[in-house]
A protein has these predicted regions:
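Glycine-rich P-loop/Walker A and Walker A-like loops and their local beta1-loop-alpha1 context
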Residues: 6-62
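Flexible inter-domain linker/hinge segments
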Residues: 202-279, 455, 463-471, 550-558, ...
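A conserved helix-loop-beta module that forms one wall/lid of the active-site cleft
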Residues: 278-343, 348-368
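Phosphate-binding/switch region of NTP-binding enzymes
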Residues: 145-200
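C-terminal regions of RecA-like/P-loop NTPase motor modules
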Residues: 2-4, 184-221
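Substrate-engagement module of ASCE P-loop NTPases
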Residues: 115-116, 121-148
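Conserved inter-motif catalytic segment of the P-loop NTP-binding fold
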Residues: 50-114
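Conserved mixed alpha/beta core segments that line enzyme active sites in large multi-domain catalysts
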Residues: 147, 265-267, 271-310, 365-764, ...
Length: 857
């Protein structure tokens, strides 16, 4: 049959009143109960069977079936609780398989609120499903319950469907009022119609019309127009105020607002009060959950403040807003990207379609009702800087950190209201688009998360800091770990925790910075550093600061020396040290100026601060049951006080290494590749190696600067060649692995080294290469989650032995594995050591790591 051809509905009078239902029509019946819909769907089913139609029933609701089981009807039973995306894609796949001219009955759309909690997602489902049905010239019946949905939700249905009918029951019969009939018209089509047993008679006489409107008026809840989200929280608030809020209602609020992940939900329910949920609800934009990052931040704050009452005045309060996860899919649907999203979820389109979809997400528009909520939020913040942070459903959960995989964007927020709105909306687009970044896609696929529902919620935080004239920043910021797997002294206690702290914005602590060295702090010995001389302290310290520039309206990195004239003396005292030796040399030449570097030394000398951080990290680990990773800022005042703003907390997957018993072999030096002490991360383990990739420091140093990235690509090519072979690979690389400055090390991405089991950063002072663990950086998080062992090979007493010549007798497979990089032969070597007995042993308690060949291995 051709598109728009008339079909029979089982009600000849209705066919006449509507000028026939047509192929391509989606017919939405707004009813007071599902039973009212049954009255009309029964004849439709019988007529379709008589006409030998391909009849399909989509079953997903809790109400009794609308169509009985019979051979002539195909039934698909689906579960909307799996999530919007899997459910909607499965419906799409069914429709695609059934093809053209199919006839459908769907369960009540209002029941989707039970699974998805809000109108927003029900409307999204209809807006993506209805057009696909239309394209295939189908006919589909959908019931929806009157009074359960917002005006906006019904408006979205009205704008998408071809036919919308209002059904009322009264005086022993049914009334039907067409609200929309696409591409059809008659003088009485949109009048209320009364069913007299055979015909649908339009009401034109005054008494009959008056009686119809009286029936409408008498219906309960007919004008409520609240969706289930609003109804639920309104009722919960009333129950709370009356002292009648149940434990099950608290569990429902946790599920709807915060998380459905079992371990996180258990912690939330243990620590949150009813007021906590209502505060979140009050600061929500849209609906859905607030995502993993927001969940972790709020949970950590509640745990810390409950268990550390003596530090209450030292915690900076938060006033964050949360863009619900439903808004992400609403944005995709509103910008007509859903078909592309479905293609991207396939095996062939997973990477291929992602780039195009990313561009579309980066340039979309927001629905007016969402944009209005953005405006109201920005009015609250005024011209205070804010940060727009990813908070996906799976992010920062047990086992999945997603560290650095999604974007966070600072908004300096200093322009006019319209300028600030444009800046903010672009920041949200950037976060949404980052879900299609190759690194995020690869991360999800490697961890088996590519088939899971991964909606993107957003956390909007006021940037914690101080205005220093033309720039804005906190006094200090950093990352804190409740357990340190990296010690540089025998007498350090890993359970005391560790900080990686910087002056200014914390981006220099969580990202692997180039040319700078954040301060590494063991909280049992906060004054201790790895450096012994003033020259070393100066060289391996922070010389650049990340700030928000209020004149250029952007995040900027500036040299510390450029900031010095603008900093008050009390602040300098807290975070800076003077290189008195350098200042003395300058004075001898008749030059008088400050030579400073940032170490946060006097802040760390404040025992109130370090004791607070140590206790906070301990309390969080104790309650989470695993080590945790946090982000924080510190703001100091001229009178010596300080406040800590806890920005983020996530459980740290500590990998396969641990405190299990490992006996280090006593190797002859001639059989030792390296032996380090207090320079590794990854716990106790034994790894029998198959492949060693070595990058020669001198060769890499002499290689043309503009082509040093070739070395990174080459390493990626080699490691990918071993994918799926379960080979144990060791990479020896000069300087910093993963730097973006090739003069400091090889600029590999994590994807280039993800197949490795062991990484070693090798020091070479003659070439200027210096390892840096970057504890707390996103690269560090990737190593931890992938269970990759790390060691630094310094030119200090921490390295007891390093003999790369041990590898030279082994066959070099470079030419075989990287033939397209002949110029790198001799710079990159690929030693096949399989079966040789070359192994790594690491013992966590002593902090020693040994790699070599033991007898009998």
């Amino acid at each position: 049959m051709a598109a728009f051809d008339p079909i029979l509905t089982g009600f000849p009078g209705l066919d006449q009143a509507l000028d026939s239902t047509r192929l391509g029509d989606n017919v939405v019946w707004r009813v007071s109960s599902v039973d009212d819909f049954r009255y009309f769907v029964g004849p439709y089913v019988e007529q379709a069977i008589r006409d030998k139609r391909n009849l399909i029933y989509i079953r997903f609701a809790q109400h009794d079936p609308l169509v009985e089981e019979r051979p002539e009807v195909k039934r698909y039973t689906l579960d909307p609780n799996v999530g919007f995306e899997p459910f909607t894609i499965e419906v799409h796949n069914i429709i695609e398989r059934e093809g053209f001219d199919a006839f459908y009955v769907f369960d009540c759309l209002s029941e989707l609120q039970v699974a998805w909690a809000a109108d927003l997602m029900m409307g999204n489902f209809f807006q993506v499903t209805c057009p696909f049905l239309f394209q295939l010239d189908t006919v589909a019946y959908f019931p929806v319950i009157r009074g359960r949905h917002s005006h906006d939700a019904i408006g979205r249905i009205r704008s998408t469907t071809q036919i919308l009918l209002d059904v009322y029951r009264g005086d022993g019969t049914y009334y039907v009022q067409p609200l929309k009939v696409w591409n059809r018209h008659s003088p009485t089509m949109f009048q209320p119609h009364r069913f007299d047993g055979t015909r649908f008679v339009p009401l034109t006489e005054g008494h009959a019309i008056g009686r119809f409107y009286q029936i409408r008026e008498d219906l309960p809840d007919s004008e409520q127009h609240l969706d289930s989200w609003e109804r639920f929280f309104t009722l919960a608030r009333m129950q709370y105020e009356q002292g009648m809020l149940s434990e099950s209602s608290l569990a429902d609020m946790c599920r709807l607002l915060i998380t459905r992940e079992e371990r996180m939900a258990e912690l939330i329910l243990r620590h949150f009060t009813a007021k906590d949920y209502f505060r979140i609800y009050k600061r929500m934009i849209g609906t859905g959950t607030i995502g993993g990052k927001s969940c972790g931040m709020l949970l950590a704050r509640r745990i810390a403040q409950t268990n550390m009452p003596e530090y209450t005045d030292y915690f900076e309060p938060h006033d964050s807003f949360f863009i619900g996860s439903d808004v992400y899919y609403t944005y995709i649907v509103a910008n007509k990207c859903w078909d592309m999203r479905i293609q991207q979820k396939t095996d062939t389109g997973y990477f291929a379609v992602a780039g195009v979809l990313k561009d579309r997400l980066f340039s979309g528009t927001f629905p007016p009702e969402i944009e209005q909520q953005f405006r109201e939020m920005l009015e609250y913040f005024g011209q205070n800087p804010i940060i727009v942070r990813s908070s996906s459903l799976l992010e920062d959960s047990f086992g999945n950190a997603f560290a650095g995989k999604y974007e966070s964007v600072f908004c300096v927020n200093s322009g006019s209201p319209e300028e600030r709105l444009r800046e903010f909306e672009q920041a949200v687009r950037t976060v949404y688009a980052s879900t299609m970044d190759p690194s995020a896609l690869e991360y999800r696929r490697r961890r088996g998360l590519d088939v899971k529902d991964e909606q993107m919620a957003i956390l909007v935080q006021r940037v914690s800091g101080t205005n220093f004239g033309n720039f804005f920043m906190p006094s200090a910021a950093g990352v804190g770990f409740s357990h340190s797997a990296y010690r540089w002294r025998d007498d350090m206690d890993p359970s005391a925790g560790m900080l990686r702290i910087v002056m200014g914005l914390g981006t220099r602590a969580v990202d692997r910075v180039d040319g700078d060295y954040p301060r590494l702090v063991s909280l049992d010995r906060p004054d201790t550093t790895t450096m012994t001389t003033m020259a070393e302290k100066h060289r391996y310290s922070q010389h650049f600061v990340d700030i928000l520039d209020l004149t250029t309206n952007q995040l900027t990195t500036v040299p510390l020396a450029q900031l010095l004239p603008h900093l008050p003396q009390w602040y300098k005292y807290k975070v800076l040290e003077h290189d008195f030796e350098a200042e003395s040399r300058l004075r001898q030449r008749g030059r008088y100026r400050e030579v400073c570097f940032a170490t946060c030394q006097n802040l760390l000398s404040n025992r109130a601060f370090t004791r607070m951080m140590r206790k906070m990290l301990h309390v969080l680990e104790e309650n989470y049951g695993v080590p945790v990773d946090t982000e924080f800022t510190v703001n100091c005042s001229p009178d010596g006080n300080f406040s800590v703003c806890l920005l983020q907390c996530r459980p740290l997957n500590s990998g396969g290494g641990g405190e299990q018993s490992i006996v280090l072999p006593q190797l002859d030096e001639s059989k030792t590749l390296f032996h380090t002490q207090n320079a590794s991360m990854g716990g106790s383990r034994h790894v029998a190696l198959d492949i060693v990739i070595e990058v020669d420091p001198a060769g890499y140093c002499g290689y043309p600067y503009a082509r040093k990235s070739d070395v990174a690509h080459c390493i990626g090519k080699i490691t990918h060649a071993f994918a799926g072979q379960e080979k144990k690979i060791l990479l020896l690389s000069p300087g910093r692995i993963g730097t973006s400055s090739p003069e400091l090390g090889v600029p590999v991405s994590f994807a280039d080294i993800a197949e490795c089991s062991v990484l070693c950063e090798v020091s070479d002072s003659s070439a200027g290469y210096m390892p840096e663990l970057s504890y707390g950086s996103h690269m560090f998080q990737d190593l931890v989650e992938a269970d990759i062992f790390y060691s630094a090979i310094f030119e200090t007493e921490q390295t007891l032995c390093y003999r790369p010549e041990l590898l030279h007798p082994f066959p070099d497979r470079f030419a075989e594995l990287a033939p397209e990089f002949p110029e790198l032969s001799g710079i990159v070597r690929v030693y096949d050591v399989g079966g040789s007995g070359l192994s790594l042993w690491s013992e966590m308690i002593s902090g020693e790591a040994v790699c070599g060949i033991a007898e009998g291995e």
